Amino acid sequence: DNVLEAVGSTPLVRLRRMTGPDDAQVLVKFEAVNVGGSVKTRTALKMIERAEERGELSPDSIIVEPTSGNQGVGLALVAAVKGYAARIIMPDSCSVERRRIMEHYGAEVICVHDEGDIGACIRECIALAQRMAADDPRVFVPQQFVNRDNLAAHVDGTAAEILADVRAAGIAIDGFCSGFGTGGTITGIGSELRT
């Protein structure tokens, strides 16, 4: 019915040129082909769907999120498809391309000046989102940095897909690595792969 139904189910791809015939197999979860172009669309969708289930969103809600990029792209996409307004707050040092994508999805992008300390700038973005929420009852801040639904997107989705793919191929997992931002990807997938 809509593009959000295509989120997930990304392929697990074997990297053949990185290893020799007697080395371990290296497999990557190819999230670049996910709707929205990254793994963050999974978390955006999960956080918004769970918020809807809890009654935290209404038709006039404004989704506001501080981010350095890909989560904003995912939330802008999900908001556009579901009919919500979106405001993404990000450091001005983040890529112009990401900003443009979010704007094309209909999000308002608010840039906070980065004085050279990205951590301080992100904290300023978070504080601005919190002020917006305090000032306007329509504002919903998913809070990717502390939202357990971020983790659940990987437990229920990404990790389950990896396990299904390796089991179908008869492959045992000896190790796992992941990029690290909010910690949701590595924590969610890692917790499931340990079991």
Where are these regions (language model features)?
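PLP-dependent amino-acid enzyme catalytic core
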Residues: 1-195
